[in-house]
């Protein structure tokens, strides 16, 4: 990547801009941190617009359950061949159409030791009596593996597999069927979405919900930058999450981007975050010290104005005692 010096301004929020050269320095640091990983970001120029694109890690921070779609209308899930059908290749006709799976005939299979001569004498011949005709249907030959699979009694039928696949969804590699379509993702578990620097917060939220087929409205959620100190900064609708991540730095041990409920989380400023992790007795001692400091400042202020008041009165008395001169 060419990180050349640039003086153009890049939008990073509503009425907020930063020099392109500064963003490129942050981007260089970001990519050095993730060197050799798929979290590295790329940038390009498109119609005089500077665009950064790549994966953004987002942690789940939900407290209430979310609802999954029962079925994706835009994607057809094709079930795998059932164990009762023959091996792949024998289900397709000449035109590539799927034929009905062949069922295994329920016959008694026994091994008969026939002499070689008898086998040659009883070999099937064609109508002209020329030479033995070999069957050219390898897809109908039963093998011992086919018989073994047939004898397993706990194998699901094709309809059962189709029904299970239809109601399965995955978030972070975990599958949920229709009975658990309402659930709460594990707090702190991480997912990612591929976005670019021109996408605003609402656009990223909709992309994330669509990725996992979540029925909840994007208006219910918000993105927060959460620091290890406890500081929580809510990303505004006009903010660009990928730019915000770059400016925060690449290390997720310092700050992470969380998906949270909009009405369940309050922002925590840096000044307040300094005291969040202290125990109650320590916080009370802080309050007592602050109260003592406030009392001292009030006392100093009162003494200052008391002195000023005395000086003014003394001067007024001096003026009153001085005889008037013509």
Curated annotation (Swiss-Prot):
Main location: nucleus
Pfam family, one: RA
Highest rank taxon of the organism: Eukaryota
InterPro entries: RA_dom (IPR000159), RASSF1-6 (IPR033614), RASSF2_RA (IPR033618), SARAH_dom (IPR011524), Ubiquitin-like_domsf (IPR029071)
Subcellular compartments: Nucleus; Cytoplasm; Chromosome, Centromere, Kinetochore
PROSITE patterns on file: RA, SARAH
Ras-associating domain mapped to chain residues: 176-264
Free-text description of this protein's post-translational modifications in UniProt: Phosphorylated by STK3/MST2 and STK4/MST1.
Keyword Ribonucleoprotein: no
Keywords: Cell cycle, Centromere, Chromosome, Cytoplasm, Kinetochore, Nucleus, Phosphoprotein, Tumor suppressor
GO molecular function: protein kinase activity
GO CC annotation, single: nucleus
All copies of domain SARAH, residue ranges: 272-319
GO biological process, one term: bone remodeling
Function: Potential tumor suppressor. Acts as a KRAS-specific effector protein. May promote apoptosis and cell cycle arrest. Stabilizes STK3/MST2 by protecting it from proteasomal degradation.
PANTHER family, per the entry: RAS ASSOCIATION DOMAIN-CONTAINING PROTEIN 2, RASSF
Subunit structure as annotated in this protein's UniProt entry: Interacts directly with activated KRAS in a GTP-dependent manner. Interacts (via SARAH domain) with STK3/MST2 and STK4/MST1.
Name of this protein: Ras association domain-containing protein 2
Annotated source species: Rattus norvegicus (Rat)
Lineage: Eukaryota, Metazoa, Chordata, Craniata, Vertebrata
Gene name tied to this protein: Rassf2
